[in-house]
Regions:
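Surface-exposed binding/hinge segments that line
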Residues: 144-202
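C-terminal motif of bacterial Sec signal peptides marking the signal peptidase cleavage site
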Residues: 18-21
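Ligand-site clamp/hinge motif
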Residues: 207-215, 240-287
Length: 431
């Protein structure tokens, strides 16, 4: 029996789950030897289900949504790659540290790469992207990608017309000087999908995010070109025959918005060939015992946090502001860490697809802390109570609730981002 393979990708705290299914149409072809083998098939259309509707910010420097990123990933390319060890490595962009100044790097972009409008991609496009991020009128979420460069802050504050730490050498080479010595300068630097200088140079920065070049006719240097956008419903893409890595095998990619609860049915019906799913859907598939569905797992660097708001945040400047006094007490933070049963939360919200972390870098990452490297806060109610007592957080009026050291009611407010799982709120209350 010939099988058509469909896949579901699931991103949890530390795993990616892939689902494959037998197709119902015997005329469809692919590799028949095994469910995860490679296929020599070319042409055709791949329909991908996405749960989050795109917001229309189809350039990476303006987007903050998964829906938009799902689209951008098909038509634009990052300038760097990440190896199996999760370390960055050259792709379109390569770099070399200056022998006499370790804050200075020389960057080169590959020659022969074209934008999807036929114009050549050069270092000018990347430099233009960086200058845009530092512009005072830029209000997107990516300023941090240029803040590490010398002179970016001065341009951001209107004290300079350009970033002093960027020097163009030729059309394919530029020199960048970082502001200070930091281990993650290269990681922080904006090397994701660039924008075209030719397309955007005559659009005021304050108007870019709402322009047709972002919302209706986006172009990139990736394997597919945007053909048609139906707001909130679908995006159609066609292959870029001039893609710098070679012509893609699949002719067309159709991205379709599908409710998470309908993903499994849509896959089994053949309405979609691939989809992004959440933990509850992964559990549903696993529990179904269907012979047509298979979940494959791999480490991921995705994580979810319960954090303390220690400072105000200046959204425009994208900087941390003054301290908030409420959680500055270390013993209070430690007590709350001991009081939270993280394993119970993972089982309740993510159905076991994950594990507790003891830092902001997941253990799957090459720089993540290994077991025993940092202090682990295991669930311990007695220890939490002891630390609260030591910090002066006691029930001083006998009402059964603790007050702060000044005798005022102590209230903890939890805020959660909007998600695709409607059961999060009632289950949080139950916990």
């Amino acid at each position: 029996m010939k099988k058509a393979y469909r896949y579901l990708w699931f991103l949890s705290l530390i795993v990616v789950v892939v689902l494959s299914a037998c197709g119902k149409n015997g005329n469809e072809t692919s590799n028949t030897s095994n469910k995860t083998g490679k296929s020599d098939a070319k042409g055709g259309t791949l329909t991908v289900g996405i749960a989050e509707p795109p917001e229309g910010n189809f350039q990476s420097i303006f987007t903050g949504s998964t829906g938009d990123s799902n689209v951008i990933d098909f038509f634009n390319d990052s300038l760097i790659d990440v190896g199996d060890d999760l370390k960055i490595k050259p792709k379109i962009l390569s770099w070399e540290k200056d022998k006499n100044d370790d804050l200075k790097y020389t960057f080169k972009v590959k020659k022969g790469i074209q934008w999807q409008d036929g114009n050549p991609f050069t270092i000018n496009d990347w430099v233009f992207t960086l200058e845009t991020l530092a512009d005072p009128d830029y209000d997107g979420p990516r300023y941090s990608g240029v803040a590490v460069i010398q002179g970016a802050e001065e341009k951001r504050n209107g004290q300079a017309d350009r970033i002093s730490g960027i020097k163009k050498i030729d059309d394919y080479t530029a020199e960048i000087t970082f502001k200070e010595h930091k281990a993650n300068n290269l990681l922080e630097l904006w090397t994701s999908a660039p924008i075209s200088e030719k397309v955007f140079k005559d659009i005021p920065v304050k108007d870019m995010a709402k322009s047709d070049a972002v919302r209706k006719n986006p172009i990139g240097i990736g394997p597919y070109k945007v053909k048609r956008i139906v707001d909130g419903e679908s995006v159609e893409l066609v292959k870029n025959k001039d893609y710098w890595r070679g012509e893609p095998n699949i002719d067309n990619i159709n991205l379709r918005v599908v409710e998470q609860t309908s993903m499994t049915q849509a896959l089994e019906n053949g309405d979609i060939d691939m989809a992004t799913i959440t933990a509850p859907i992964a559990k549903e598939i696993k529990d179904s015992g269907s012979e047509n569905l298979q979940l494959l797992q791999a480490p991921s660097t995705s994580y979810a946090i319960v954090g303390f708001v220690l400072n105000d945040y200046d959204k425009k400047a994208q900087k941390i502001g003054k301290e908030r006094p409420k959680y500055q007490d270390k013993k209070l933070r430690q007590a709350m860490a001991y009081a939270i049963n993280r394993k119970e939360w993972i089982d309740a919200f993510y159905y076991g697809y994950g594990k507790p972390l003891n830092g902001l870098i997941p253990s799957a990452h090459w720089s993540g802390a290994k077991e025993g490297d940092v202090k682990e806060y295991k669930y311990d109610v007695d220890k939490a109570k002891q630390l609260l007592d030591e910090g002066g957080y006691k029930d001083k009026d006998g009402d059964g609730f603790r007050e702060d050291p000044q005798g005022k009611p102590f209230v903890v407010n939890l805020k959660h981002y909007a998600g695709s799982n409607p059961t999060f709120e009632p289950r949080t209350a139950a916990l």
